[in-house]
Amino acid sequence: MTVLYTSASLKKMKCLAFNMGMNCVRTVSHARSGGAKFGGRNVFNIFDSKTPDSVRIKAFKNTIYQSAMGKGKTKFSAMEINLITSLVRGYKGEGKKNAINPLQTNVQILNKLLLTHRLTDKDILEGMNLAAGPVNVAIPRDITPQEEKKKVELRNRKAENMDLHPSRKMHIKELLHSLNLDMCNDEEVYQKISLYLQKNEESRTSVGASQQNHVDIDINSLKRYLQNIEKKARQKSAIDKQKKNQARIYQWNTQSFSEIVPLSAGNILFKREPNRLWKRLQNGISVFLGSNGGGKKSKTTKKVLQGNNILLHSLENNKDMTLSNNFDHSVFNINFTDLFGVINASGSPPDRVLNEINEIELKGWKCVGNLYDNNKIVVFQSSNPLLEDTKIPQKSFTNSKRFLISLSALLASFFAYYRYRLSQRQESKK
């Protein structure tokens, strides 16, 4: 086996060659790159995009390591200081704690991040590109005292509009105008809104003594509250209109509409007596032909629901309101549900609600549900039984049948007499 011995001179030559290679990697002509002093020596500019990225990153890491270990006095340029500071601040967990650290502390932190591989080459390259990019710095002009005064007034005005004060009546009117609410009685609306704000103020007294004179109101909640007031006002006006219409009842001549007659001035102004003989003849012919009119109509029982009246019962004040079947029920949003649904949604003791419902149902009403927007109001409908149309009496039907038979016999006799006279005339001519 051959053993090779390396002399000391050969080792020295290898070390010199290695150091020369490192210097070749680190150094480039200062005049060629237009560089600056980096790490205290005339080396290339690491922010030069013409230099390969790997070479720039490697040179930057080596200089940070040398400066952190205290090997020589390092002088960094302004761009390099910005790069070091941005890398330390940009790393997650180090930015806020070391935002105002001195340069040497930032170098120590950056070296630690590089050694633990928590900072990648991609992060270093992005930081170099950002630091080397052009920065537009616009120097703001001086603000005049008049402009500063206007800015303060505008800020105070915005802060004032954000608050709602119950003691200010004009502010409530402005809010109603912004919500496009056309209320007839502004005083009543103002009193209700003020009471609503006062309740909110009393409920917020536990927050703190400094906030007792300040009321923070949700605009959406206030808008829904005002919409409920407007809806109740529409319902009240509809009920009043329905009551006025009930007071004006006209006595129309129902006999003139019992049969289809041609429309004319005489039919409108004067009472028209129906022809009873012709009507009886029509009924008799209808029965004889087996049509659906006349007597056969009496066999078909037509069901008519008598009593569609609505009763609204309030569980709060125990008051009732009755609406006739001519009233437009679409104004009220009725929730049709069973008895258990009404009791559960009322929020009142079940025994009391059940007793009130039973008392009203004993008067001939039937519980059908409640109102969607107010579960305290129970809706009832009159529960009168289905009545049948009155049948034509059997005597009237018999009389019509007799009249029809008599008329048929009369026509047959007339036809037979006509044939008899015709045959006699023909015989006399012969």
From Swiss-Prot:
Main location: mitochondrion
Signal peptide location: none
Induction notes from the record: During M phase of cell cycle.
Transmembrane segments annotated in the record for this chain: 403-420
Swiss-Prot/TrEMBL keywords: Membrane, Mitochondrion, Transit peptide, Transmembrane, Transmembrane helix
Domain of life assignment: Eukaryota
Coiled coil region boundaries: none
Subcellular location: Mitochondrion; Mitochondrion membrane
Membrane topology, as annotated: Single-pass membrane protein
GO CC terms in record: mitochondrial membrane; mitochondrion
The keyword Transmembrane helix is assigned to this record: yes
Span of chain positions assigned to the transit peptide in the UniProt entry: 1-27
Quaternary assembly: Associates with the mitochondrial ribosome.
Function: Component of MIOREX complexes, large expressome-like assemblies of ribosomes with factors involved in all the steps of post-transcriptional gene expression.
Protein name per Swiss-Prot or TrEMBL: MIOREX complex component 4
Species of origin: Saccharomyces cerevisiae (strain ATCC 204508 / S288c) (Baker's yeast)
